[in-house]
Amino acid sequence: MEGDFSVCRNCKRHVVSANFTLHEAYCLRFLVLCPECEEPVPKETMEEHCKLEHQQVGCTMCQQSMQKSSLEFHKANECQERPVECKFCKLDMQLSKLELHESYCGSRTELCQGCGQFIMHRMLAQHRDVCRSEQAQLGKGERISAPEREIYCHYCNQMIPENKYFHHMGKCCPDSEFKKHFPVGNPEILPSSLPSQAAENQTSTMEKDVRPKTRSINRFPLHSESSSKKAPRSKNKTLDPLLMSEPKPRTSSPRGDKAAYDILRRCSQCGILLPLPILNQHQEKCRWLASSKGKQVRNFS
């Protein structure tokens, strides 16, 4: 087949050998190659061709300068400011801002009609496939294991699985707070669906422990002795500032103080029931501890 074609000396194109003589005569007389695009153009229209095809124009979207002949291709495929549809909200967005827009748009949630959960847009398509299969299994009567329950940790602001919550609190919560919420010998974790019952149980234990009436003053030396015996087990652990800052009980007090120690009020910060004579000083220490914990959480994050 190569022998049936010949190359024109003027336009550098392959021409059928049968028509080569006629083509070359016409091409040399009437056509000339454009110096910009190297395309054969009639001699009388060369000036018009250069103005129309090779004139420098600017893109209206990105203001980039280019030849007029390349403008349409640039707008459709190369321009970084061309409008592109967001795959989540189906709105047109500039290509240069599309990635940032989709990161925010994909984080929005939508209610799944199958399971009633709020799912992020970027995971919605995958979730619907899983949800349909689960609904199909439910329709067939197959048993689906319930999702693992999680409990919110107020110290690190994360959701922790229920079966790991106790061990997580041992690392995340200060020692004194951990012992207060989880007394030694009772490591069970109450279900998160019964917060009021857990609060009542903790309040009852707190009320028994932190009610220093004058007729039970002799209990404090026993408490210090028991704490001193447990001290060697945790030499590296720091003492709770709240426990260190509580005032020592008076050795002798008038009858009016006895009535004041019988009146219990709840701390506005931690909710512990305390007698009136020591409530104010405890609240000051409790606010200081809460502010220091907030700073530690912000520094960690």
UniProtKB/Swiss-Prot annotation:
One of its GO terms (biological process) is negative regulation of type I interferon production. One of its GO terms (cellular component) is cytoplasm. InterPro entries: Innate_Immune_Apopt_Reg (IPR051986), TRAFD1-XIAF1_Znf (IPR049439), XAF1_C (IPR041386), XAF1_C_sf (IPR031220), Znf_RING/FYVE/PHD (IPR013083), Znf_TRAF (IPR001293). It holds the Pfam family Znf_XAF1_N. Widely expressed. Expression is frequently down-regulated in cancer cell lines. Isoform 5 is widely expressed. Expressed in placenta (at protein level). It comes from the Eukaryota. The keyword Zinc applies. Induction: Up-regulated by IFNB1/IFN-beta in cell lines sensitive to the proapoptotic effects of IFNB1 but not in apoptosis-resistant cells. Up-regulated by TNF in trophoblast cells. It is found in: Cytoplasm; Nucleus; Mitochondrion. Residues 193-205 have a biased composition (Polar residues). Keywords: Apoptosis, Cytoplasm, Metal-binding, Mitochondrion, Nucleus, Tumor suppressor, Zinc, Zinc-finger. A zinc finger (TRAF-type) spans 22-99. One of its GO terms (molecular function) is zinc ion binding. Residues 189-257 are annotated as: Disordered. Seems to function as a negative regulator of members of the IAP (inhibitor of apoptosis protein) family. Inhibits anti-caspase activity of BIRC4. Induces cleavage and inactivation of BIRC4 independent of caspase activation. Mediates TNF-alpha-induced apoptosis and is involved in apoptosis in trophoblast cells. May inhibit BIRC4 indirectly by activating the mitochondrial apoptosis pathway. After translocation to mitochondria, promotes translocation of BAX to mitochondria and cytochrome c release from mitochondria. Interacts with BIRC4; the interaction is not detected in. Interacts with BIRC1, BIRC2, BIRC3, BIRC7 and BIRC8. Part of an complex consisting of BIRC4, XAF1 and BIRC5; the complex formation requires IFN-beta stimulation. Interacts with RNF114, the interaction increases XAF1 stability and proapoptotic effects, and may regulate IFN signaling. PANTHER family: TRAF-TYPE ZINC FINGER PROTEIN-RELATED (PTHR16295), XIAP-ASSOCIATED FACTOR 1 (PTHR16295:SF17). This is XIAP-associated factor 1. It comes from Homo sapiens (Human). The gene is XAF1.
